[in-house]
């Protein structure tokens, strides 16, 4: 440790800092390494209040960790970024970034300057992304809907729902396709936020289902209300339907006790008048984000209107978008009157209540404006339902990215090995100091297939060697039959090498490209650091006499 010069804290410099950073990053990568791939293992995480999470989703594992080391925090943020941008590949991006750092650190120990390594890594990442787009990408149009289902299955293969991937892949693809929309620029988008996920304990995961409509996990305000309404006109309110109360601070002087009853009566009359105006506008379903008292409920029952109260504002906004309704925050007009117009109402074909497990749910089908979908997840217990939810989120993101980018690549380590062989040849063409960095970059790419094979209890060295031989033959030959070998990847269940495009092991091209870019950028960010100053925490002394 270097002596501090007027600094109230610790200062580390040079190789000590780099070794320290690499050790911290490798520690994080080793936590998630065994969870990679279809044979990956799960992690049990217990937080400070004793809540248990069982998962093998890299982003979820790292989100639960309370990481102290600043370099390790960069890697945790890297997995969150991958989760946000792509939704899948969070584990592999962390493992790749850690391997790049480890190899870069070895080069620095051998007197290669960090700037040369950084330049080499940037060149290698750029060349790798170009090669994926030009040689490895396969158009979704060529493979059809089957490509989407296979991409979803590949995402699920490492998750708890892997054995039921035939059911869930169909659900996911149908859900994403049902929320298809075209924005103002004319681009086709698949906003998966419009896919509502409802979790309900009980029965098997095979009883999970897709609902082409919107589902709310709530029930009617009163059991006397209708359970089904056809041609629903929906009023969306962001205020309560309780008895009218005067504001705090207003005083009323009552001379006659009989007038107290008149005040109570008037309070109820104002509420009834509000309900009447909404119903006269044509509403037969009233949804509010606040309360609805017995007076309003009784009036709605008599009018044959379904009422829902305390609905989450997030759900209210989604319903407004789907049904074409307007969220009304007040009935008051600038003139001081109270008005509710028919144009505020949303529309859908039918609204009905149905029990799902122990919970009652309200279903909205045939929405007027935007398409929406809901997935009802069933499962034995809370842990299982939560893990299915996380798995479906990843798969929804994968299918969305596949549809929006229009390209997939073979999985099972095929891309990493192909890039490794390509970059080896590319490194030999460089006559600069960056050659060693590019060579180490292509060696680092081998970590993904090696970890995949090791987690599946296979001989990683033998399998990766076979795979490298096939990809080398593919890239060095003009024979169309040998060119097809570029799609070869690992078959982890049998411990063989196979054509993963024919086997249906596919991943979105965007996922691979962003993984490479993010991992390289994170490694470069940490590699640039050669000095770390950690200030001592300030001791705030309490004034005398206070404890």
Curated annotation (Swiss-Prot):
What role does it play? Molecular chaperone; assists the folding of proteins upon ATP hydrolysis. Known to play a role, in vitro, in the folding of actin and tubulin.
PROSITE patterns recorded? TCP1_1, TCP1_2, TCP1_3
Cleavable signal peptide: none
Q: Which family does this protein fall into?
A: Belongs to the TCP-1 chaperonin family.
Q: Share what the entry says about its subunit structure, partners included.
A: Heterooligomeric complex of about 850 to 900 kDa that forms two stacked rings, 12 to 16 nm in diameter.
How is this protein named in the record?
T-complex protein 1 subunit alpha
Origin superkingdom: Eukaryota
Q: Which GO terms describe its molecular function?
A: ATP binding; ATP hydrolysis activity; ATP-dependent protein folding chaperone; unfolded protein binding
Location in the cell reads: Cytoplasm
The entry's cellular-component GO terms read: cytoplasm
What keywords does the record list, in alphabetical order? ATP-binding, Chaperone, Cytoplasm, Nucleotide-binding
